[in-house]
């Protein structure tokens, strides 16, 4: 009998991303992306054997309709009977979950309890989870939380300096994100360098449209840049990152903006997009900065400066630095950003190897610092889907 496959789902409020993986080899046999869910022109795109095709979802434009279309596609390729379990990415498990878990009614209630911590994401994850339970009847479901990896942070790192009853009553603290990526990359970095991860003090930068950075020591998260929500920390595609909280009062008073408007502005209209006035896409920002566009140049400069500053602070949290790791779409592909960031870090004993830095792109891992550097900087491609598949297989007994 052929080995059971794992279906991995990642649901957003208007999207559903899916992949069918062979847990042993990590091969992706089928992938899909549903977009514009809950709108009349919803659709889903499937990719199988390098071929793409689109299916209209206008008759059932919700998450359930997307999962139904996925089931039909699996049947068409004879894959439906080979699915052994389903793994779901969930943004926030709050303090309830420090590791991945097999889904039951109690877990669903727990994810619901964490909705205030991820109001944009957790409701969508629940829609996808319920759709999977109803359409893939009898299959085990596993949830993998973005926040779990950071539950090892010490109190000095996760607490905010506010009245403590706010933490006790409302769970107001730093939770972090991208934990599944950090767990995968920490393991891969140790394997790539031929070391035990418990012997490595790592600072890992997960850089994409959402960007964060984490200090890892003894294989565990010691501190991270994202906070109560993913808004804290680095300059991102559309998020401001760190900002003086009194900005809310200032804008309410002087610009007549509501809390909801300010929150949306800081999450969706700030970052690279807000500074440049052009785009949230780092590739566009790099191209336009090279052509002399002032806004793009400033956006790139601010992104790099904030990142370098955070690397220094995360080296403190890790107790030193053995390996600086770049991952995520920007971290894996932008040799320009990596070189400029490392240019700030000579005081940590890091020197860029320009040739190696150019080679470490498009899925290629590699050390990008010179042999005489006191620590290494390395590029390690992330694979959150594979990490979710591994957890799902383990917890469902496959």
Swiss-Prot record:
Q: In which pathway does it act?
A: Metabolic intermediate biosynthesis; acetyl-CoA biosynthesis; acetyl-CoA from acetate: step 1/2
Q: Which GO terms describe its cellular component?
A: cytosol
Query: Where are the active-site residues found?
Result: 146
- EC number(s): the record gives 2.7.2.1
Which PROSITE patterns does the UniProt record give? ACETATE_KINASE_1, ACETATE_KINASE_2
* Protein task: Catalyzes the formation of acetyl phosphate from acetate and ATP. Can also catalyze the reverse reaction.
User: Which PANTHER family has this protein been placed in?
Assistant: ACETATE KINASE (PTHR21060:SF21)
Q: What is this protein called?
A: Acetate kinase 1
Query: What lineage is on file?
Result: Bacteria, Pseudomonadati, Pseudomonadota, Betaproteobacteria, Neisseriales
Q: Which gene encodes it?
A: ackA1
């Amino acid at each position: 009998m052929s080995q059971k496959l794992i279906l991995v789902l990642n649901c957003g409020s208007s999207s559903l991303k899916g992949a069918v993986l062979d847990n042993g080899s990590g091969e992706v046999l089928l992938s899909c992306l549903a977009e514009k869910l809950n709108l009349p022109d919803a659709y889903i795109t499937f990719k199988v054997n390098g071929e793409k095709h689109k299916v209209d979802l206008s008759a059932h434009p919700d998450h359930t309709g997307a999962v139904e279309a996925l089931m039909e596609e699996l049947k068409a390729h004879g894959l439906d009977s080979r699915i052994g379990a389903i793994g779901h990415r969930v943004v926030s498990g709050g303090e309830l979950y420090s590791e991945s878990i097999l889904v039951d009614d109690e877990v669903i209630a727990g994810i619901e309890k964490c909705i205030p911590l991820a109001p944009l994401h957790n409701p969508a994850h629940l829609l996808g989870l319920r759709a999977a339970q109803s359409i893939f009847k009898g299959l085990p479901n596993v949830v993998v939380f973005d926040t779990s990896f950071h539950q090892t942070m010490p109190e000095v790192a996760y607490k905010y300096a506010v009245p403590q009853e706010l933490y006790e009553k409302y769970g107001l603290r730093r939770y972090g994100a991208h934990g599944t990526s950090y767990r995968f990359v920490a393991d891969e970095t140790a394997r790539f360098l031929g070391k035990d991860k418990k012997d490595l003090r790592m600072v890992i930068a997960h850089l994409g449209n959402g960007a964060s950075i984490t200090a890892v020591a003894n294989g565990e998260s010691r501190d991270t840049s994202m906070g109560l929500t993913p808004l804290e920390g680095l300059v991102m595609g559309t998020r401001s990152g760190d900002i003086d909280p009194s900005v809310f009062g200032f804008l309410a008073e002087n610009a007549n903006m509501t809390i909801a408007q300010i929150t949306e502005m800081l999450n969706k209209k700030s970052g690279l997009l807000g500074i440049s006035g052009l785009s949230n896409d780092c590739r566009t920002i790099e191209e336009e900065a090279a052509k002399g566009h002032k806004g793009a140049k400033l956006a790139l400069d601010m992104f790099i400066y904030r990142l370098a500053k955070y690397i220094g602070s995360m080296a403190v949290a890790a107790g030193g630095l053995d390996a600086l790791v770049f991952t995520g779409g920007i971290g894996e592909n932008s040799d320009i950003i990596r070189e400029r960031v490392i240019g700030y870090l000579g005081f940590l004993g890091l020197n860029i190897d320009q040739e190696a830095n150019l080679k470490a792109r498009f899925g290629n891992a590699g050390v990008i610092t010179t042999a005489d550097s006191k620590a290494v900087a390395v590029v390690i491609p992330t694979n959150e889907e594979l990490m979710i598949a591994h957890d799902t297989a383990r917890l469902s007994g496959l």
